[in-house]
Amino acid sequence: MTAEKIHAGIAVAMKLFAERGWEADVGLIRPDESAVPTVERQLASKSYDCVVIGAGVRLPPRGLALFEAVINAVHKAAPGAAIAFNTRPDDSADAAARWLPA
């Protein structure tokens, strides 16, 4: 998937979050040592009911350590938030809907 397709999918997801009446933020991370501090800063900025973690973090086998680090950072920084997983950028609202009240 190209960066262009990812950003287009994120734009669709943000529209779908808004249509459901939910406030949403995008927190992009790099696949390096800056990922965990970036997640921690984002989650410290306010309270979240759900955090959706995209396939770009979850799926590459070489990214398993990054995935574990991100999950643990979310768990520590937002212990009350549900954790959801999308299958593509534009279904993030559906992923959150599985865990958030209608």
What is each of the regions a protein language model found here?
Residues 1-9:
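Glycine- and acidic-residue-enriched helix-capping/strand-helix junction motifs
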